[in-house]
């Protein structure tokens, strides 16, 4: 498993986890999770994350889980399996949470994410 963190600014960071290859994950060939975390003095607070946890047919595309309503998933849809499009959609969700003034910092962090297919 590959994991690491990418700082956005002094208050937020991205944490990624790319698991080992698994044939159950059709398009990306592995499970992955990317978390947006708020940095606090003594701990980190979970804000949202993107993953591809569903392996059933037609649900291969990544989706976002938000902290305030954990049961709600925002699906990108099968038509957006292009990694660049997925990163742009994820960037928009991050900016909605941390504010438009942090868009440039968030964009720099999101561009450092590598595709799970590699």
Spans of features found by a protein language model:
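Negatively charged, low-complexity tracts enriched in Asp/Glu with abundant Ser/Thr
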Residues: 1-38
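Small/flexible residues
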Residues: 4-5, 19, 46, 61, ...
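Acidic, aromatic-enriched beta-alpha/helix-loop junctions
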Residues: 28-72
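Mixed-charge, Lys/Arg-enriched low-complexity segments
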Residues: 53-118
């Amino acid at each position: 498993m590959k994991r690491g963190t990418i700082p956005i600014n002094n208050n937020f960071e991205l944490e990624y986890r790319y698991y080992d290859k698994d044939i159950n994950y059709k398009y990306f060939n592995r499970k992955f999770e990317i978390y947006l975390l708020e940095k606090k003095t003594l701990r980190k607070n979970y804000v949202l994350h993107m993953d591809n946890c569903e392996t059933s047919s037609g649900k291969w595309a990544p989706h976002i889980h938000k902290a305030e309503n954990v049961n709600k998933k925002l699906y990108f849809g099968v038509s957006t399996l292009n990694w660049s499009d997925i990163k742009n959609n994820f960037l928009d969700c991050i900016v909605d949470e941390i504010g438009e003034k942090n868009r440039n910092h968030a964009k720099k962090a999101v561009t450092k994410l590598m595709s799970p297919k590699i």
